[in-house]
Amino acid sequence: MNKIKCFFKLIRCSNLLMIALMTFLVYYCLMFPMFKTGIVGAVPSSPAFILLVISLLFIVAGGYVINDYFDVEIDKINKPDKLIVSRVFSENVTKFFYITLTFLGLLSGLLSSIMISDSKFYLLFAILFLLVCMLYSYSAYYKKKLIVGNLIVSVSVAFAVFLPWLFEILYLSNNTLILYAVGDTLMLTLPYVLIYTIFAFFMT
């Protein structure tokens, strides 16, 4: 099999595109229009948000890779014809993919966090790191525990939908005057974001 094609299958490229689409739709179609208040600085720069979405995609891609890594023995029995880990990529190479993707995800998240909040950048980075831990824990320990495993996956997907609102909160926390001016608008967007978040949680 073509290794490039197999790599994109390994990271579930179609799933990543769907996550990116959901995140951008929530931010640019729901939240962004509501923040056109004329107040300079009410909306962070697009590069910072795009970098954060890239971070999320790297982290989730790493989660898919480590999931297949821990599933290799089961996949050898259940779907040997679709096996990628150990057949196309060795287990060591697969681990390298996971480490690289996760590192790039955390690095992108750190840079985005610093861009939107000089004083509280560690908060968003800590949440992204927690997502990394959740995805790894799901693959390594909790997948066989049906309720816990499904809960971790659902929370991870729902986080992608809630991320834009959290991003905006951390950005506005830099300037209390702007936060006060657009606070009502921010709270107005919350119910809609929560509806999409809950929908994503239960549909996973």
Question: What are these model-predicted stretches?
Answer:
Residues M1-T204:
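Multi-pass alpha-helical membrane architecture of UbiA-family
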